[in-house]
Amino acid sequence: MFKFNKKKLPSRHTSLGPDKAPQRSFYYAMNLTERDVAKPFVGVVTTWNEAAPCNIALMRQAQSVKKGVKTSGGTPREFCTITVTDGIAMGHEGMKSSLISRDVIADSTELTVRGHCYDALVGVAGCDKSLPGLMMAMVRLNVPSVFIYGGSILPGRFNGKDVTVVDVFEGVGKHSSGKMTAHALRKLELKACPTAGACGGQFTANTMACVSEAIGLALPYSAGTPAPYEQR
């Protein structure tokens, strides 16, 4: 009746046989059809939150991922996990949460996929610890997986030049040494980060995005497209 034979897939434990009728009832409650339940379940995880621009576009990107999964014959199952953004956390007690968050991301993603017997995983992340966190989970799970970088932020314009958050950091130093007025610093901070996306510099997010391609978890040339672009 259906295209896919799930007898050897992990999701058989939650969708095949008379004894799985209760689980299937839950799926039908979420408007899945019998045909949907008979297809491979593909987890779509993002680290979306409103903590910083790094992650703010990820939920929208996930909807495109889900369309792709459906087109390819799978049934997408979206979920989110936490992230701690270094750009907000650093310089105070919050930075103690940063590295730990990487392992929480990996652990929570792994637990969700194992707990619900998903057959494959697509992960979308946008900041320093979330990229390696999702990639760690993919390696542990050993199921078909694809990593997608949320993309870098676009530069802003200030005094006729491209600027990024790096210039704001430097501006803080200039202000502290008396080389920039408070008014100029305020104008700079208002212009430096005009869009969604990860920090516009060769920091951990953009670096790990390159690594994701190099180790084969991301598709070639997928990391370079900025977050606001429709191609992303």
Name each model feature, range by range.
Residues 35-149:
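Long, structured ligand/cofactor-binding scaffold of large enzymes
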Residues 3-11, 42-49, 82-96, 189-194, ...:
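Gly-rich Lys/Arg/Thr-decorated short loops/hinges at beta-loop-alpha junctions or inter-strand turns
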Residues 9-13, 34-38, 73-81, 182-188, ...:
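Flexible, glycine/charged-enriched surface loops at secondary-structure junctions
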